[in-house]
Amino acid sequence: MADHGEQDALAAGLSGALTSFGHRLMARVYYADTDFSGVVYHARYLEFFERGRSDFLRLAGVHHTELADGKHGEKIVWVVRRMEIDFRASAKIDDILTIETRTKDISGARITMAQQLKRGDEMLVEAKVEAAIIGENGRPRRFPKDWIEAFMPEVV
C-alpha cells in the first residue's frame, strides 16, 4: 500500500511543529478541497495557510480563544490586512501538503508572514500575509513583547 506521505504527517503531530525558521504543518487534500476539474479550488489555499498560521500561533503560546476571552485585559482578535498569493502549480486529491510559515517582520501592531505550500519539494503556492491584532473597538493593539520573541525564529 502506498504511503502518500502519511508517516511524515503523523510524525509532525496535529498542530505541526515549530522549526528553526518558524512552523511546519502537514495536511492532506480531500475531495471537499477540490473543484470540478479535480484540483484544489483556489480559495482552499487560503484555508490551508490559515491553518498554518493558527497552529504556528498555538505552538508559540498564543491561543485565539484566550484572546477573545480577554486574557490580555481586553478582547482582541487577529485580522488579515493584506495578502499576496502566487499560484505556481495545483494540488490534487490525496496529496500530502507541507505548509511552512515564517515571520518576516513584526513591529508595533503589525506582523508579516511568508508562507509556502509544497507537495514534497515542489513549490505549489506562496503567500505573503500582513496581519494585526485589534481590540473590541476595531483599533489596532501593539503586540506584547513576549509575542515578538515567540514569533521571530532564532538567528543561527
Regions found by a protein language model. Give the residues of each.
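A short, structured loop/turn motif at beta-sheet edges
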Residues: 17, 118-123
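Generic short beta-strand
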Residues: 31, 114-116, 131
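C-terminal end-helix/capping segment
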Residues: 121-145
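Core beta-strand residues in small-molecule sensory/regulatory alpha/beta domains
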Residues: 88, 116-118, 134
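Conserved GNAT-family N-acetyltransferase fold
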Residues: 49, 115, 127
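Residues that cap or initiate secondary-structure elements
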Residues: 33-35, 91, 107, 121, ...
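Hydrophobic beta-strand-centered segment that forms part of the acyl-chain substrate-binding groove
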Residues: 56-98, 102-105, 110-111, 125-126, ...
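Hot-dog-fold acyl-thioester-processing enzymes
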Residues: 2-80, 136-156
